[in-house]
Amino acid sequence: MCYGIIVMILFSLYKGLAPNSAIVGISIMIIIAIGIYLIIEYAIKKIIG
């Protein structure tokens, strides 16, 4: 479910800001960073819990 939301945000950003590649690049980097953080947080909870 979380990945679907991220993909939808990514797609809407790409559609809306396609001419401005810098904003798209920064947005993609932020979304990837959030995704990595969530994966790490999930893994830590799995290991500890």
UniProtKB/Swiss-Prot annotation:
<keyword id="KW-1133">Transmembrane helix</keyword>
<dbReference type="GO" id="GO:0016020">
    <property type="term" value="C:membrane"/>
</dbReference>
<protein>
    <recommendedName>
        <fullName>Uncharacterized protein MJ0185</fullName>
    </recommendedName>
</protein>
<keyword id="KW-0812">Transmembrane</keyword>
<feature type="transmembrane region" description="Helical">
    <location>
        <begin position="22"/>
        <end position="42"/>
    </location>
</feature>
<keyword id="KW-0472">Membrane</keyword>
